[in-house]
């Protein structure tokens, strides 16, 4: 998944056209859907790593949340792959804000890959957990009006950890040789974030 945000409430058509243009290197079927708060591009294609499976790339653009709790950041970005080489500066969130929205997603949906993202973020960066929780609360209040209690969040996660779809959804997304333990990721998030709610 890729997630982007519209920085203001202007129309999104020009950006959508540009996204489709730069993603022409993906061989596969594209589907575009627009709603009140989200525009979604979905691509279907085959994996390059055996066993070959059908994969989906979903690019969601949030067209409702036009704010950054911790302020915007300009980052240098470069890509060098078999398909594309390029560089630019992008306007993005601070990492803690991205993880605050990821924590909201972890609560609201059944995607075990969110735990994987947290584990990698904690392994690779020194993070301000207070800022992550501040952003989580802000985005929960904005989207649903109420922030779940620590107990509610923990019960939600304990139920998800029993769900095979939640546990197994990361399998096709990581290389077979990569070592990943979902329980370890959950324990880390519990200690670093849930217990501090």
Question: What spans do the regions from the language model cover?
Answer:
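Structured mid-to-C-terminal alpha-helical surface segments
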Residues: 2-197
């Amino acid at each position: 998944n890729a997630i982007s945000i519209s920085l203001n409430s202007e129309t999104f058509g020009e950006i959508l056209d540009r996204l489709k243009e730069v993603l022409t290197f993906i061989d596969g079927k594209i589907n575009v859907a627009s709603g009140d708060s989200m525009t979604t591009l979905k691509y279907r294609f085959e994996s390059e790593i055996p066993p070959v499976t059908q994969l989906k790339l979903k690019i969601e653009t949030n067209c409702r949340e036009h704010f950054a709790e911790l302020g915007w950041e300009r980052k240098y970005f470069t890509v060098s792959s078999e398909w594309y080489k390029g560089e630019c500066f992008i306007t993005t969130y601070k990492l803690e804000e991205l993880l605050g929205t990821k924590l909201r997603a972890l609560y609201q949906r059944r995607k075990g890959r969110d735990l994987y993202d947290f584990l990698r973020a904690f392994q690779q960066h020194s993070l301000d957990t207070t800022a992550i929780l501040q952003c989580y609360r802000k985005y929960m209040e904005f989207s649903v009006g109420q922030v779940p209690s620590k107990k509610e969040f923990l019960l939600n996660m304990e139920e998800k950890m029993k769900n095979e779809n939640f546990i197994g959804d990361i399998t096709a997304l990581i290389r077979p040789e990569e070592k990943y333990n979902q329980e370890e990721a959950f324990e880390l998030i519990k200690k670093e974030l849930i217990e501090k709610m």
